[in-house]
A protein has these predicted regions:
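Conserved structural position within tetratricopeptide repeats
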Residues: 10, 41-44, 74-78, 112
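Alpha-helical segment of the N-proximal tetratricopeptide repeat
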Residues: 12-48
């Protein structure tokens, strides 16, 4: 981990480190605590960055700190009420807590401003399916296509 090498003063540690990219890599590897450390360092370089904060919330969720994850998602939404990722993540945390009504609001907000990108379709389909189930509608995922 780059932050560890930098702390120990190993060769190359003085180079500019992309803590966000490092955190994303660690998150993909399942090294959630290490990812959280890297994202916190990225946040120091870009205080309040909603993208970094959403990654922190994901890391919190993966290590079981769902209350911290919820707080972080809510903080993002205070800064940017259209942050699709925060609506998505918070919706599923709320569902785990039995807060279906509030989760519906966040799923609707997510679907009003869905993300684009390689993984977006999977998340949009999942949100549509979940919303249909919560509303008691038939689960036809392809009705909007």
């Amino acid at each position: 981990m780059t932050w560890w090498k930098k702390l120990l003063g190993e060769d190359g540690a003085s180079d500019k480190v992309d803590y966000y990219a490092e955190g994303a890599d660690l998150l993909r590897e399942g090294r959630f605590h290490d990812a959280l450390t890297s994202f916190r360092l990225a946040l120091k370089e870009a205080p309040g960055d909603p993208v970094v904060l959403q990654q922190i919330a994901i890391a919190y969720t993966r290590i079981g700190q769902t209350e911290e994850a919820s707080k972080t998602y809510r903080h993002v939404l205070q800064k940017d009420p259209t942050a699709a990722g925060a609506h998505y993540g918070l919706a599923y945390l709320l569902l785990r807590q039995g807060e279906a009504d509030e989760a519906v609001q966040h799923l609707e907000a997510f679907l009003q401003n869905p993300p684009s990108g390689p993984d977006a379709g999977e998340h949009v389909s999942h949100a549509r399916s979940t919303l249909a189930q919560l509303r008691g509608e038939p689960g036809n995922l392809f009705s909007d296509l």
